[in-house]
């Protein structure tokens, strides 16, 4: 396989983007189960408020439109047969989605507005299947959807820092300067291009200073931003200075 072809292989089959144990959960629900309704909340921690952000990115990138094919289902079946054992994968369930829904996922996902601050122990997002034959699908998607923890965490922490800095500016500075008081230089400090993009985008909810280009691009591509959401300046580094 050429490098260019393998670049995005981990996200090219949605059926395999879940935890292994979920492959067998379709067998474990009580007979007659038709609908499963699940929700996401922040149980609490060091902050009393949670800033919700990042869901739209995951919906548009992974879940919207025709996202499952027969080829995906067969690949997943072969994988699970070897990974867990024959007969453990829900071939008919996934083929039902391919044949009857054109590869679209029969679920409804609702959420609070992105960027909003919500008290902990409140619902942030819900998901429910709309086809009674796909009761197993609701929590199958949990693995992917819970990745919102990262942009939520960045947005919440960044928001708390903004409040702390703003308090000090009111005491001994100029509150009008708050948007540029915490600059994001995190591009090189995270584990992937996707992490950089969604993390930096979350930070830009609260501040406007960033050198993480990926965050601006995420907002432009997945949030239809028409404005320049982040700003930087001409600046030097060691190599340009020590060269003299």
What is each residue range found by the language model?
Residues 4-47, 97-106, 115-119, 124-244:
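Buried, small/hydrophobic-residue-enriched core segments of structured protein domains
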Residues 36-90:
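Low-complexity, highly charged intrinsically disordered N-terminal segments
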Residues 66-127:
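Glycine-rich, N-terminal phosphate-binding loop and its surrounding beta-alpha-beta segment
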């Amino acid at each position: 396989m050429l490098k260019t072809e393998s670049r995005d292989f981990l996200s090219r089959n949605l059926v395999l983007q879940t935890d292994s144990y979920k492959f067998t959960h379709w067998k474990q629900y009580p007979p007659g189960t038709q609908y499963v309704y699940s929700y996401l909340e922040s149980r609490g921690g060091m902050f009393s408020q949670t800033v919700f952000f990042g869901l739209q990115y995951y919906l548009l990138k992974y879940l919207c439109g025709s996202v499952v094919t027969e080829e995906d289902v067969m690949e997943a079946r072969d994988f699970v047969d070897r990974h867990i054992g024959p007969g453990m994968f829900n071939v008919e369930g996934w083929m039902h989605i391919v044949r009857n829904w054109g590869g679209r996922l029969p679920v409804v996902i609702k959420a609070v507005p992105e960027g909003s601050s919500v008290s902990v122990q409140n619902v942030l997002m819900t998901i429910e299947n709309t086809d009674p034959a796909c009761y197993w699908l609701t929590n199958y998607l949990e693995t992917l959807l819970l990745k919102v923890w990262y942009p939520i965490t960045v947005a919440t922490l960044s928001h708390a820092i903004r409040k702390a800095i703003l308090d000090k500016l009111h005491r001994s500075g100029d509150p009008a300067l708050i948007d540029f008081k915490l600059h994001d230089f995190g591009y090189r400090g995270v584990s992937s291009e996707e992490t950089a993009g969604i993390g930096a985008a979350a930070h830009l909810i609260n501040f406007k200073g960033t050198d993480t280009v990926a965050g601006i691009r995420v907002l432009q591509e997945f949030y239809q931003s028409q404005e320049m959401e982040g700003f930087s300046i001409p600046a030097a580094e060691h190599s340009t200075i020590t060269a003299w």
